[in-house]
Protein backbone atom coordinates (compact mmCIF):
# COMPACT_ATOMS: atom_id res chain seq x y z
CA UNK A 1 0.00 0.00 0.00
CA UNK A 2 2.91 2.35 0.68
CA UNK A 3 4.21 1.74 -2.84
CA UNK A 4 0.82 2.67 -4.29
CA UNK A 5 0.77 5.93 -2.33
CA UNK A 6 4.30 6.69 -3.53
CA UNK A 7 3.29 6.02 -7.14
CA UNK A 8 0.18 8.17 -6.89
CA UNK A 9 2.18 11.04 -5.46
CA UNK A 10 5.02 10.80 -8.00
CA UNK A 11 3.04 10.39 -11.24
CA UNK A 12 1.25 13.79 -11.11
CA UNK A 13 4.52 15.57 -10.39
CA UNK A 14 6.33 13.86 -13.25
CA UNK A 15 3.47 14.44 -15.69
CA UNK A 16 3.20 18.10 -14.68
CA UNK A 17 6.93 18.64 -15.25
CA UNK A 18 6.74 16.77 -18.58
CA UNK A 19 3.79 18.80 -19.89
CA UNK A 20 5.34 22.07 -18.71
CA UNK A 21 8.58 21.23 -20.52
CA UNK A 22 6.68 20.20 -23.64
CA UNK A 23 4.61 23.39 -23.62
CA UNK A 24 7.74 25.50 -23.19
CA UNK A 25 9.43 23.68 -26.05
CA UNK A 26 6.44 24.20 -28.34
CA UNK A 27 6.26 27.89 -27.42
CA UNK A 28 9.95 28.37 -28.18
CA UNK A 29 9.68 26.51 -31.50
CA UNK A 30 6.74 28.71 -32.48
CA UNK A 31 8.68 31.79 -31.41
CA UNK A 32 11.73 30.85 -33.50
CA UNK A 33 9.80 29.44 -36.47
CA UNK A 34 6.42 31.18 -36.64
CA UNK A 35 3.73 29.63 -38.85
CA UNK A 36 5.81 26.49 -39.33
CA UNK A 37 2.69 24.50 -40.17
CA UNK A 38 1.78 26.81 -43.05
CA UNK A 39 5.08 27.51 -44.84
CA UNK A 40 6.03 23.98 -45.99
CA UNK A 41 2.70 23.50 -47.76
CA UNK A 42 2.79 26.79 -49.68
CA UNK A 43 6.49 27.11 -50.49
CA UNK A 44 6.37 25.31 -53.85
From Swiss-Prot:
One of its GO terms (cellular component) is chloroplast thylakoid membrane. The chain crosses the membrane at residues 7-27. Gene3D superfamilies: Single helix bin (1.20.5.510). InterPro entries: PSI_PsaJ (IPR002615), PSI_PsaJ_sf (IPR036062). Pfam families: PSI_PsaJ. Keywords: Chloroplast, Membrane, Photosynthesis, Photosystem I, Plastid, Thylakoid, Transmembrane, Transmembrane helix. GO terms for biological process: photosynthesis. It is a single-pass membrane protein. It is found in: Plastid, Chloroplast thylakoid membrane. Belongs to the PsaJ family. May help in the organization of the PsaE and PsaF subunits. This is Photosystem I reaction center subunit IX. It comes from Lotus japonicus. The lineage of its organism: Eukaryota, Viridiplantae, Streptophyta, Embryophyta, Tracheophyta. The gene is psaJ.
Amino acid sequence: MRDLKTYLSVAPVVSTLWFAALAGLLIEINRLFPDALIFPFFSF
